[in-house]
């Protein structure tokens, strides 16, 4: 198991203690049983269908089954599906290798989607059309135009849709955003999001797919290629064909918080420029090697919002990012460093760390009552608990599909910028790259026949 997957799964499954630096119980999944205990009757519990039964798919469904009953599981890897049937459905869940058959079941109320990234949008759109509420793993989309489609269908169907950007349900991150929104740092001038670099690997040997894996179906909308074990399951994120590398994997988290901090849930930066290193050679934006990881390993992209706020997305904060926060408190490899005219603030997931002058001053000058609750739209404390409360009440979840689309668009644009090796301009109103026809074509991808995304 790679460190990224292990850390994330621990974050999802934690039922943790109080956070010493904040004296607040973490929001994410710590208090999940509260709502679950309210549903005393088995008839009150929603029926859940699990689509994607790998490590992360099981992680989110583990949390979901506190509030509902898993009645069906689906995966194109038969071994994954059988393990999920035993684990999630106590051996009673119906097993599928085609998600469409699961969606045909009228008794399923909720689906969890924990597939590789290139399947998220197609499954989510068809699930909404089938009348299901959705909890989908991040990043929600493979391209910018996929995000436009998924937002369109979400508006039309009015289904409850929670994205797995659970840092919005984590106390220190919500508190950091509240401090920014309440002006405790002064005017925000710059945010640096350090998200870690991608993996290197390859060349890998092409093989026959194992008999328990439907490789052709796993590939979905992407080109039909020979099987390499390192292309699929947890390693899919290091291939641009199926994901966006660390830019979308961890950018989905930290860039989302950056957007939230500056009130940019309905927009994206207007300019992008930067540099990157890749593990294989590129030509015209495409990798020239087909048997090795190809997403960026090191990068620094400077973006700017229309109001002048700068957002830097980097694999690690170099020393050129100076701050008044002590080095002993910083983690330059992962976290958000937020610069304000009055002071700086740092927050990350490691030990739920939150530091800066504004944090210290809050002890004598607390945030206004309800500041965090208003920011979180009245959400329940746990991320999954919030989702199931929204299923019950029909309100909008804290990590809604529309704000996520804007944040992940920023990540997609950063990847387009470094793959083409040039600066790009973005019109957030028209949702279109400006003055660059070639770059504009990268807002979508050709989809393999039989696996097209239709609305």
Predicted regions, residues:
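N-terminal Rossmann-like NAD(P) cofactor-binding module of classical short-chain dehydrogenase/reductase
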Residues: 111-112
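NAD(P)-dependent dehydrogenases' Rossmann-like dinucleotide-binding region
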Residues: 52, 184-202, 214-228, 269-280, ...
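N-terminal secretory signal peptides and thylakoid transit peptides that target proteins
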Residues: 1-19
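N-terminal Rossmann-like dinucleotide-binding module
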Residues: 18-89, 167-170, 258
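C-terminal helical cap and adjacent loop that interface with cofactors, partners, or active-site loops
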Residues: 14-20, 27, 35, 59, ...
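Beta-strand-loop-alpha-helix segment that lines the small-molecule cofactor/substrate pocket
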Residues: 116-117, 121-169, 183
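Rossmann-like dinucleotide-binding domain that binds NAD(P)(H)
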Residues: 216-308
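Basic phosphate/pyrophosphate-binding loop/patch that engages nucleotide-derived ligands
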Residues: 152-158, 175-189, 197, 207-209
């Amino acid at each position: 198991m790679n460190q990224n997957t292990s850390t994330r799964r621990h974050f999802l499954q934690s039922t943790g203690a109080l956070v010493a630096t904040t004296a607040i119980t973490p929001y994410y999944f710590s208090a999940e049983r509260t709502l679950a205990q309210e549903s005393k009757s088995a008839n009150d519990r929603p029926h859940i269908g699990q689509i994607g039964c790998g490590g992360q798919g099981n992680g989110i469904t583990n949390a979901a089954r506190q509030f509902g009953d898993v009645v069906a599981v689906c995966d194109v890897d038969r071994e994954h599906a059988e393990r999920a049937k035993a684990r999630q459905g106590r051996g009673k869940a119906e097993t599928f290798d085609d998600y469409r058959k699961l969606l045909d079941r009228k008794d399923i109320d909720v689906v969890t989607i924990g597939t590789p990234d290139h399947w998220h949008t197609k499954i989510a759109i068809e699930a909404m059309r089938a009348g299901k509420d959705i909890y989908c793993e991040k990043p929600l989309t493979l391209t910018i135009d996929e995000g436009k489609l998924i937002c369109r269908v979400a508006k039309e169907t009015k289904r409850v849709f929670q994205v797995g950007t659970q840092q919005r349900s984590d106390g220190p991150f919500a508190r950091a955003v509240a401090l920014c929104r309440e002006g405790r740092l002064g005017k925000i001038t710059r945010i640096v999001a350090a998200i870690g670099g991608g993996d290197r690997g390859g060349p890998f040997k092409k093989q026959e797919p194992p008999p328990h894996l439907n490789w052709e179906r796993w590939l979905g909308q992407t080109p039909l290629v020979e099987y390499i074990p390192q292309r699929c399951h947890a390693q899919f994120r290091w291939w641009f064909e199926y994901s966006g590398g660390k830019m979308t994997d961890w950018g989905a988290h930290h860039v989302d918080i950056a957007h939230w901090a500056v009130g940019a849930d309905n927009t994206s930066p207007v300019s992008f420029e930067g540099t990157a290193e890749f593990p294989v050679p590129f030509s015209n934006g495409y990798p020239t090697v087909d048997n090795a990881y190809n997403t960026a390993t090191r990068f620094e992209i400077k973006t700017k919002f229309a109001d002048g706020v700068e957002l830097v997305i980097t694999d690690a904060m170099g020393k050129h990012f100076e701050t008044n926060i002590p080095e002993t408190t910083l983690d330059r490899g992962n976290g958000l460093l937020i610069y304000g005219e009055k002071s700086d603030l740092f927050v990350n997931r490691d030990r739920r760390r939150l530091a800066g002058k504004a944090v210290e001053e809050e002890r004598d000058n607390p945030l206004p009552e309800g500041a965090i609750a208003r920011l979180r739209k009245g959400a329940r404390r746990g991320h999954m608990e919030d989702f199931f409360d929204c299923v019950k009440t029909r309100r909008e979840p804290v990590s809604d599909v529309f704000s996520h689309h804007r944040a992940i668009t920023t990540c997609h644009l950063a990847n387009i910028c470094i793959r083409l090796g040039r600066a790009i301009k973005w019109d957030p109103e028209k949702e279109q790259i400006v003055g660059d026809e070639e770059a504009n074509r990268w807002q979508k991808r050709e989809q393999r026949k039989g696996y097209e995304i239709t609305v």
